[in-house]
Amino acid sequence: MTKYILASASPRRVEILGKLGFEFSTEPSEAEEKLKKDFNGLAPREKVEELSFIKAADVAEHLILTKETKEGEAYIVIGADTVVAADNQILEKPKDREDARRMIEALQGRSHDVYTGVTLIYIPESVQGHKGLKAEDKYLQLFKILENQMNEEKGEELSEIGSLIDGLLKENRIIVRTFSEKTEVSVYPMNEAEIESYISTLEPYDKAGGYAIQGRFSAYIEKINGDYSNVVGLPAGRLYREIKEVYKCTKNLLKTI
């Protein structure tokens, strides 16, 4: 039996995954906040793929080291990250009202891109809760050191999130798939009153790019080229197919697992 864990508390991602028919639990990752890493030098696609891996690995590593599971129980951890980019420049969540205005002004009357990166980590029962991990396992030792550092030095950069996952992947003991999708969104021209009205709502302030395509901003969407759900936070069609590929790959894991 395979259980799914979404490494996000996003209501929009929860809704999309639920509509695909999967039963899952949520375990939000705090890895991005822990890392305090500057991703500004990365292209949009590179950033979402790297962050999706970090989020999934953060939850997966905790699961591997702490979760006691029933025999035959496996997990797929799903991490995701979404950014809006205009002229290849990433627009984060607006910091305040003026930042939201700047973003909407930059997006209105033109097209922009939305990227979502997703990482799937398949964890068989044999590597959960220390099962299959020897005490002298160098990846386990490394992770324990990092975990102690995290407890002792809150706020320090944790650049090694994913080390345990990378090690297990190299040994063919788990499966990791990272991918991304791009959707082109065209926005109608907006006048000052429309912009002012929109940023006066609460909608822009927890959204990448300062807008919610499924909310009031839908009135200003001219057309979409690509997957609509990708803009909301998860590329539903691609995600479903990638999960199917994960199951195909499970037969290639080491026989000792």
Each model region followed by its residue ranges:
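N-terminal polybasic phosphate/anion-binding patch
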Residues: 1-76, 87-90, 128, 145, ...
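GST superfamily/GST-like fold recognition
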Residues: 2, 6-19, 110, 146, ...
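Residue-level signal for inorganic ion chemistry
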Residues: 17, 52, 81, 100, ...
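Active-site-adjacent loop/tail segments of enzyme domains
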Residues: 47, 82-112, 187-189
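Short beta-strand segments
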Residues: 78-79, 117-119, 214
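Short beta-strand-to-turn element immediately C-terminal to the catalytic PLP-Schiff-base lysine
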Residues: 85, 121-123, 221-223
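A short beta-strand signature
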Residues: 113-123
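Internal, charge-rich low-complexity segments
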Residues: 122-156
